[in-house]
Amino acid sequence: GVLWFSTWDGINRFNGYDFKVYKARQGNKITMTNNRVDLLEVDPYNYIWLQTYDYRVYRFDQRTEKFEQIPAEGEEEGMRFSSIKILPDSVIWLLSENEGAVRVKTNPKDYSITTQVYATHSRGGNAVHINQVFSDAYNQEWLLTDNGLLKITNDKEEPVSYFVNIQSGKDEPVQAFYSFC
């Protein structure tokens, strides 16, 4: 196996003998917009997911040594991600501070990805901030938000809402959820 390290100057792979540095430089094909990497995660398909200092997320293919920005440029380009959550069923959630989240699913045959945006104005979610994501024993995904719970089931694309305040008034109470077990 290898070890991966995030640094302020790209990511580093250590194979037990040597280090290899991956960072954007003029003339190379690495497309990261910032070399400072604040977070690294690995998914079940052995892709490295990284979040850079400018709150962008990339998927790094260790086989081809290529970086892919997620979501792709143009798709929700302005979203700033603060965390990456990899669920046991290989679904990946990219969470932002106040713009919702992006759900990423990898096709196990060709490793292509599909993304769904769960922003504050879409998919039935009225949450401003998603605090946590997890999947239960039935592979239902739960989003704990500052305005209720959202549940995504295997048979529905739209989430089911619990304890969500749909009123637009600022002084209306909301039920925030922070943790689970």
Q: For each predicted feature, which ranges?
A:
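Carboxylate-rich, polar loop motifs that coordinate divalent cations or form catalytic acidic clusters
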Residues: 1-181
